[in-house]
Amino acid sequence: MRIAIATCSLLPEGHDYDRPLLPALERAGADVALEVWDDPDVAWHDYDRVVVRWPWDYTHKRDAFVEWAESVGDRLHNRPAVLRWNSEKSYLADLSAAGLPVVDTTLVQPGDPVPELHGEVVVKPTVSAGARDTGRFSPAVHHEARALIERLTGAGRTAMVQPYLPAVEARGETAIVMFAGRESHVLRKRAVLAPDEQAPPADHELGSAQVMWDPELVRAGEANDAERELAARVIGHVAERFGETPLYARVDMLTDGGGRPVLLELEAVEPALYLATTPGAAERLAAAILSPPT
């Protein structure tokens, strides 16, 4: 079976976090090639399956990325419809409307007035990755939060405002990685944003915040039953919505003030899966790719 792994021109060999996937696929008998997603010379129809892994520049050109996904069609995983929906964080409103516990999120579109802010908040754009253009603001610097919202919406982008949940300081984020609807491994990510920190500095061509490249940021972790139940509900909703279980997904969650898990993000476009943190994770993803969900 011929498998194309879609990456970007800035990561032509992929990224260390998830590179173990390539030899795992080869050991399983696949013919694997890394291809740059927006290279016009790639014949995507020559591949049996195309798997999105490292197109980490897509947030700069989302429309082109979605068009590319739709042109590749049904050989693509995750599916084009999932990529279109999940590549803008307004999908959180859909999940909340479906009754899933989601971190309270206010969307501010271009032309909307800046909403009243309460307590410590996080501001970020709906199309972004790697903590880019993101800030954490206490009430003392709400004027800076409003300025970031206005900068984003003034540039034609939609901003989102969420409360900062202090439980992240003690426990971090829990991320459950799912392959074909089954749990593969659990990650623990420490807090990224320092108090009153706006748009952390980037030191990488992809524009991700400096802290996102810290090798100590994410480690193998454990999930409790409530977190596992939430991850299963989220993936179940996506499967029902699109008629197919996503091949891969990372379900990021925090603990709210009442001690229950709430969804922070569902990463189903190009999440870092941190395959190297957990023995067998790369092999599980390879098996899912070679026998994708239906």
Regions found by a protein language model. Give the residues of each.
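Glycine-rich phosphate/pyrophosphate-binding beta-alpha loops
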Residues: 56, 131, 192-195, 267-277
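Phosphate-binding site of ATP-dependent enzymes
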Residues: 139-241, 262
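Conserved N-proximal alpha/beta basic substrate-recognition cap immediately N-terminal to
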Residues: 9-109
